[in-house]
């Protein structure tokens, strides 16, 4: 229950504080992997609480893993950075896939 409430609070903050920016694709040097920045985490979660970060990371992992299995994309890893949550794929993800991940995280209920 606590985890659900925290996720709801994060989602509510996201809808109140910012209008979601467009996802940004950046190519890593010397690698075929693509890093996809989903949203500016600092502007959504204003606390540095480890518990909140763990809940948020689990939420992102589950959403992206589910979408990867549905679209047969190959997931390499998900990284929760200081400024952003990102996931890395073996091949360049489609814009539709990025949009679906982005939308699913913000519209999680």
Swiss-Prot record:
It comes from the Eukaryota. Residues 17-43 form a propeptide. Contains 2 disulfide bonds. Keywords: Cleavage on pair of basic residues, Disulfide bond, Ion channel impairing toxin, Secreted, Signal, Toxin. Expressed by the venom gland. It is found in: Secreted. Residues 1-16 form the signal peptide. The keyword NAD does not apply. It comes from Hadronyche infensa (Fraser island funnel-web spider). Probable ion channel inhibitor. This is U16-hexatoxin-Hi1a. One of its GO terms (molecular function) is toxin activity. Its main location: secreted. One of its GO terms (cellular component) is extracellular region.
